[in-house]
């Protein structure tokens, strides 16, 4: 059983992110932000964003937390914009 803290540090989450990065890399070898459509260049700038917000009550529902269709790969800055942190 996960809580949000342990989920985002889990091997399951890390493996899913690595898989999504490989799957979503285009023919030019670029990974594109699914929010602003600009290239994701720096490894530390790539965030896996859940379209349906992950909460303590749904983190263990893998149809939400580990569903590739529920995850966007986006810039750190874009993630902050989505969550109104600017």
Feature names for model-found ranges:
Residues 52-70:
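Short linker/helix segments within small regulatory modules
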Residues 41, 68-86:
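Short Cys/His-centered divalent metal-binding micro-motifs
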């Amino acid at each position: 059983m996960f809580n949000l803290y342990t989920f985002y540090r889990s091997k399951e989450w890390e493996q899913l992110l690595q898989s999504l990065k490989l799957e979503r890399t285009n023919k030019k070898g670029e990974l594109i932000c699914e929010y602003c459509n600009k290239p994701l260049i720096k490894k530390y700038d790539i965030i896996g964003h859940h379209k349906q917000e992950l909460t303590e009550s749904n983190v263990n529902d893998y149809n939400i937390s580990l569903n590739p269709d529920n995850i966007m790969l986006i810039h750190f800055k874009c993630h902050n914009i989505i969550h109104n942190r600017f």
